[in-house]
Amino acid sequence: MPLTKILIYLLFFILPFGQLERLPNLPVYLHDLVILLLIILNLKFIKLPRSIWLFVSACLLSLIVNIFRFGFPQILFSSLYLVRWLAYACLLPIYQHEKIDLKPLLKYLCLALAVLGLLQYLLIPDTRFLAVLNWDDHYYRLISTVFDPNYLGLIFVLGLVLFNLKILPSLILLIALLFTYSRSSYLALIVVGFYLALIKKKFKIFIFAFFALIFALYLLPRPGGEGVKLERWFSVESRLGNYREGFGLWQKSPVSGLGFNTLRYFRNDPISHAAAGLDNSFLFVLATTGIIGLLTYLNLLKSLWQTSLLLKLSLVAILVHSLFQNSLFYPLIMIWLWCVVYL
């Protein structure tokens, strides 16, 4: 077996470990090192679409014009996430060259996260101790190895799209999704279902599935804590405040932005895992790369939309979710997206 294929299998073996594969005291994961090796081995085969380079150029421009605002060390550090984003995009031509079947690997990834998550929910339901490591303190929510029920929930939604209603794996993913108590993920699933019903003209099935989901949500246990209250309002108020902050940051530099991934230097809590982003991917792009960056990113998304139904359904889920989380720039979601683009 060629070394490239071995590394791809290794990549998907590592991914379910989530935050456990993060290197100590570094914003780098083991899977990042595997991807770096893949790029080095396949450099001559890597040719990226123009839409990707346009967005990268807009990000670089945003960093260059803000170099005197932050200084070179801060700009260099901020640019590392752009390097990661570009590295993940480089997986696409590597997959295309190897002609590898990624569906079984993606199915393994989401099911592994679901099984690990269900075990975590049963054995370690109280994960508030993770707050000392600057993670959110969750109580009786399924977080698996990702430590974030919202991004994890989106992975389960994408897995449901991929499995296309195969009963056993879909049931496992749906149960895991329910126990994340992630409203943004529930909404993503509902919108995907509605979009599919619109295409297939099967509205009766959608209506039945919709009310079945509502009934299942009603039956969910409420063991205590705000996180499991689906009617919780504090997170809505927090998100609205986050949106206002994002628009305020954008107004500081509306054309070219404040610099890609520089928001940590404007936040009150720069060590938090959420300090570098906003609760909306489009607002994140707008604030950091300005109108120029947002237009190039929308152009990239438009180019991706003109492909398979699987990709369209996956994009619908991610785009809906990204209105409430910075989903489009979450590592695991980015890797998943480029895999589906290849499929």
Q: For each predicted feature, which ranges?
A:
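Transmembrane alpha-helices of multi-pass inner-membrane enzymes
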Residues: 36-41, 161, 311-323, 327-343
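Hydrophobic alpha-helical transmembrane segments in multi-pass integral membrane proteins
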Residues: 18-61
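A membrane-periplasm/extracellular boundary helix in multi-pass inner-membrane enzymes
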Residues: 115, 121-124, 180, 197-234, ...
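Hydrophobic, aromatic-rich transmembrane alpha-helices
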Residues: 34-45, 157-166, 291-308
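Long extracytoplasmic/lumenal interhelical loops at the membrane interface
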Residues: 230-244, 248-252, 256-289
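Alpha-helical transmembrane segments of multi-pass inner-membrane proteins
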Residues: 94, 103-138, 144-200, 310, ...
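Aromatic-anchored transmembrane helix interface
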Residues: 54, 63, 72-97, 110
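Hydrophobic transmembrane alpha-helices and their immediate junctions
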Residues: 190-194, 198, 203, 288-319
